């Protein structure tokens, strides 16, 4: 009986062999995948942005408000604790010279009361008689010379102060000038009690208009002293 030749079980040329993977990709449609991927991407972006915002607020250094910041404390010579000003030089000068009440009472005391004190009345010289007063009223009196006003206030010298024995001075006597100083030379500055800072007794007579004109002329808005 003749034997019929069997075909080889190997791959046959020209005939594509269908595989299981190709059948799976062909069967599953790709239409629903696109909206699902877009939804997942949107959710991921939302979580990333939220995490970045929370981290920025958590780790950001708070910026202090310049109007409410604490003053700077500085130790000066002599063991004094000073507070550095936070405003500009123009604001401080306008506040200083524009205030209605004096900020410093470093000036001469006001005129005494007409009656005076009991000690003043007791030590007062006897009053002059009436004829002498009538004669003095007939004599023309020259007005006293008024010294020219200075920009700075200074205490009156011994020659300029009127010597009145009927008044009792309550201000302490000033120290006498040293022997080594010449007459007319400026007095050396005196340190304040318990400090090395000088005690400046001169206070300028400057109005608020002059201060504003000075800053307008200088053209400076904020300069630190």
Curated annotation (Swiss-Prot):
<feature type="region of interest" description="Disordered">
    <location>
        <begin position="106"/>
        <end position="163"/>
    </location>
</feature>
<keyword id="KW-0597">Phosphoprotein</keyword>
<keyword id="KW-1133">Transmembrane helix</keyword>
<keyword id="KW-0812">Transmembrane</keyword>
<dbReference type="GO" id="GO:0016020">
    <property type="term" value="C:membrane"/>
</dbReference>
<dbReference type="InterPro" id="IPR031499">
    <property type="entry name" value="DUF4689"/>
</dbReference>
<feature type="transmembrane region" description="Helical">
    <location>
        <begin position="32"/>
        <end position="52"/>
    </location>
</feature>
<feature type="modified residue" description="Phosphothreonine">
    <location>
        <position position="113"/>
    </location>
</feature>
<keyword id="KW-0472">Membrane</keyword>
<feature type="modified residue" description="Phosphoserine">
    <location>
        <position position="195"/>
    </location>
</feature>
<feature type="modified residue" description="Phosphothreonine">
    <location>
        <position position="117"/>
    </location>
</feature>
<feature type="region of interest" description="Disordered">
    <location>
        <begin position="178"/>
        <end position="200"/>
    </location>
</feature>
<dbReference type="Pfam" id="PF15755">
    <property type="entry name" value="DUF4689"/>
</dbReference>
<feature type="compositionally biased region" description="Low complexity">
    <location>
        <begin position="122"/>
        <end position="140"/>
    </location>
</feature>
<protein>
    <recommendedName>
        <fullName>Transmembrane protein C16orf54 homolog</fullName>
    </recommendedName>
</protein>
């Amino acid at each position: 009986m003749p034997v019929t030749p069997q075909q080889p079980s190997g791959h046959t040329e020209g005939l594509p062999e269908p595989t299981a993977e190709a059948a799976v990709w062909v069967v599953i449609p790709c239409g629903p995948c696109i909206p699902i991927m877009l939804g997942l991407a949107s959710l991921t972006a939302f979580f990333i942005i939220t995490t970045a915002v929370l981290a920025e607020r958590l780790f950001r250094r708070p910026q202090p408000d310049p109007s409410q910041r604490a003053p700077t404390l500085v130790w000066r010579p002599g063991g004094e604790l000073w507070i550095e000003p936070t405003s500009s030089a123009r604001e401080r000068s306008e506040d200083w010279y524009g205030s209605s009440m004096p900020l410093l009472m470093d000036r001469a005391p006001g005129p005494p009361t007409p009656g005076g004190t009991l000690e003043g009345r007791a030590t007062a010289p006897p009053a002059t008689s009436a004829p002498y007063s009538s004669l003095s009223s007939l004599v023309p009196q020259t007005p006293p010379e008024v010294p020219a006003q200075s920009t700075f206030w200074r205490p009156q010298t011994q020659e300029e102060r009127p010597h009145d024995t009927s008044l009792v001075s309550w201000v302490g006597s000033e120290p006498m000038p040293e022997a080594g100083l010449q007459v007319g030379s400026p007095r050396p500055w005196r340190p304040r009690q318990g400090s090395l800072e000088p005690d400046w007794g001169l206070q300028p007579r400057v109005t608020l208009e002059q201060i504003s004109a000075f800053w307008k002329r200088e053209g400076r808005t904020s300069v630190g002293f």
